[in-house]
Amino acid sequence: MAKRTKAEALKTRQELIETAIAQFAQHGVSKTTLNDIADAANVTRGAIYWHFENKTQLFNEMWLQQPSLRELIQEHLTAGLEHDPFQQLREKLIVGLQYIAKIPRQQALLKILYHKCEFNDEMLAEGVIREKMGFNPQTLREVLQACQQQGCVANNLDLDVVMIIIDGAFSGIVQNWLMNMAGYDLYKQAPALVDNVLRMFMPDENITKLIHQTNELSVM
């Protein structure tokens, strides 16, 4: 019986986290109370306090348990691209955007991060969350270095600048799309968006190759 009770408690805890994600994304973190979350989850205020001391603890737990976007898209990537760092990078960027476009929970989390939260010192640091939902700087640098070695990224480019541009371009694409999701089909446009960003860093002779790459990547 105790085992079942523990399982039920864990199930309730996760339901509260999922409800909090929906409430935070809709109303904003500062405007959402634990009582709002309890009501939406159809539990008592006492029940939510049994699991979380306060809203900040719930907020932090929500992000701490969240896998990175890099982990979430891994199963949707093509095997065998390890020796082609440029195509590997291209695919990850496309599939990442398409995953966001298809998965409402991911959209809700990103809305919270970009549009619905004012961070304070007690919250998990914004930079930690942004890295979880975006690029790992060291990994991105290593991939870009490999691309330069293979001639896919121009050798005269400063990779620090390239990384800033890539991070700004894709976080900007996602932020703007989340404000007007009906404005365009992010899933369909993902290959073109990625190719136009990457084209800025390619030697001229490689651009023609990119134009002929298939745009038929899909996460589903």
Swiss-Prot record:
UniProt GO molecular function: DNA binding; DNA-binding transcription factor activity
Keyword Repressor: yes
Keyword Magnesium: no
GO cellular component, one term: protein-DNA complex
UniProt cross-references to Pfam families, sorted A to Z: TetR_C_2 (PF08361), TetR_N (PF00440)
Gene3D superfamilies: Tetracycline Repressor, domain 2
GO biological process: negative regulation of DNA-templated transcription; response to xenobiotic stimulus
DNA-binding stretch(es), residue numbering of this chain: 33-52
Classification via InterPro entries: DNA-bd_HTH_TetR-type_CS, Homeodomain-like_sf, HTH-type_Tx_Regulator, HTH_TetR, Tet_transcr_reg_TetR-rel_C_sf, Tscrpt_reg_MAATS_C
This protein's UniProt keywords: DNA-binding, Repressor, Transcription, Transcription regulation
Domain of life: Bacteria
Occurrences of domain HTH tetR-type (ranges): 10-70
Described purpose of this protein according to its UniProt entry: Potential regulator protein for the acrEF/envCD genes.
PANTHER family in the record: ACREF/ENVCD OPERON REPRESSOR-RELATED (PTHR43479), ACREF_ENVCD OPERON REPRESSOR-RELATED (PTHR43479:SF11)
NCBIfam families: PRK09975.1
Protein name: Probable acrEF/envCD operon repressor
Organism of derivation: Escherichia coli (strain K12)
Gene name of this polypeptide: envR
